[in-house]
């Protein structure tokens, strides 16, 4: 009675698409949204701010490291020498050099940066992507919230919200030559006519049971399946998950390359599919890239990743801008924390949440500015420190979501989306 994978996996995609009904029931106090979609680039492990967006050339050698600063399109603003392409689009970005929190553990830092809350043993809070799915729901046949290539952290999930608000993870890396997304194609032996026939049979059986028992859960379940069918039946939605139609020029713009001998996948393929997903209607796409936890041999680790990230990120910004999408697409680049200002005895940098850098672009964010500052050693905030509550509240504001609104947590206890967060006007266009 079920279509291939849908029967084998229970609700599967239908469960994911439960968010449509939840969004319909939501009584959100909607603000005017500047951003229609978000592309969130998560640099997993702890990204070194002083070797990327906040170099300190006048610091002692054990602090400044080995990368020279290079000029950007913003007068007097410098990035590290591995950020050559991003330096050319600095006039389209806001670089925050004063991000700060207190969590030195990876998982605790992730929870803080993804939810706007410090971790609590009593409650796991929902990620921004899951709140967006809950509050705004899907567009057309696309899932609201997608993770590329996988859910890079448990705290990118739905927290205390329903699992239906969790991300749809691709389950495969678009940089691989054999890339395909599970669950998006009809199984072998089931053509379009057979697919529609099975759908009709299920609707007939559901109608029979609905006449015998009026149950809200049954009615809700029915809508989940309908959404799953809609995605399977939409060629446009399925096409968004493929890179086959992209030109060689676009691939070159993103710096796409085959899977190489070094175990570092191409950022370009991941960022390009993120653009395709928001273009097709996805509201929130999180792309996880890299392994930045460089406690030893720091510069060896970043030299295999940072140029790839640089090319792909600059390509994404250019592509969105040229397509007229940047003003309505909020792009975020963040990590769970930064890295220690001083290089350790093993040639590495350790965890450092006290100050680090993030990037925001498009979607109502001011173009061409540096917000905040770190001190001379990139060790502490020196100006306009930005905490997680205000950062996440500002992201919600740009999406038209009131972060002061309460959602219902377990035990029917109202819980603000963010507690005591303020919109940072200095970040807004």
Spans of features found by a protein language model:
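Ligand-binding pockets and gating/stacking loops
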Residues: 1-429
């Amino acid at each position: 009675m079920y279509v291939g994978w849908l029967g084998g996996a229970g609700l599967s995609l239908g469960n994911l698409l439960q968010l449509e009904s939840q969004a319909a029931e939501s009584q959100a106090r909607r603000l005017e949204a500047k951003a229609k979609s978000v592309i969130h680039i998560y640099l997993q492990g702890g990204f070194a701010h002083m070797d990327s967006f906040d170099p300190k050339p006048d610091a002692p050698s054990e602090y400044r490291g080995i990368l020279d600063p290079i000029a950007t399109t913003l007068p007097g603003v410098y990035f590290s020498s591995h950020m050559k392409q991003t330096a050319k689009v600095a006039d389209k970005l806001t670089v925050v050099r004063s991000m700060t929190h207190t969590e030195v553990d990876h998982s605790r830092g992730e929870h803080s940066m993804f939810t706007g809350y410090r971790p609590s043993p009593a409650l796991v809070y929902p990620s921004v992507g899951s709140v967006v799915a809950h509050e705004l729901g899907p567009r057309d046949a696309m899932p609201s919230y997608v993770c590329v290539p996988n859910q890079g952290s448990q705290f990118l999930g739905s927290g205390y919200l329903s699992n239906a608000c969790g991300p749809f993870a691709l389950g495969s890396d678009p940089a691989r030559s054999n890339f395909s997304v599970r669950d998006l194609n009809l199984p072998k032996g089931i053509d379009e006519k057979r697919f529609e026939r099975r759908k009709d049979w299920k609707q007939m059986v559901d109608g029979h049971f609905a006449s015998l028992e009026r149950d809200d859960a049954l009615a809700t379940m029915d809508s989940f399946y309908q959404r799953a069918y809609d995605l399977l039946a939409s060629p446009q939605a399925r096409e968004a998950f493929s890179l086959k139609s992209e030109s060689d020029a676009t691939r070159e713009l993103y710096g796409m390359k085959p899977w190489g001998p070094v175990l570092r996948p191409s950022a370009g393929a991941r960022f390009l599919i993120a653009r395709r997903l928001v273009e097709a209607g996805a509201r929130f796409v999180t792309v996880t890239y890299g392994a930045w936890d460089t406690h030893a041999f720091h510069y060896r680790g970043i030299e295999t990743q940072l140029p790839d990230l640089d090319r792909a990120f600059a390509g994404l910004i250019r592509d969105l801008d040229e397509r007229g999408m940047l003003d309505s697409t909020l792009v975020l680049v963040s990590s769970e924390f930064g890295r220690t200002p001083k290089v350790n005895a093993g040639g590495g940098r350790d965890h450092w949440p006290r100050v680090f850098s993030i990037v925001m672009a498009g979607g109502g964010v001011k173009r061409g500015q540096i917000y905040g500052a770190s001190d001379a050693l990139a060790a502490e905030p020196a100006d306009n420190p930005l905490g997680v509550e205000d950062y996440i509240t500002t992201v919600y504001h740009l999406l038209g979501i009131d972060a002061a609104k309460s959602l219902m947590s377990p035990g029917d206890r109202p819980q603000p989306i963010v507690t005591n967060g303020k919109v940072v006007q200095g970040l807004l266009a």
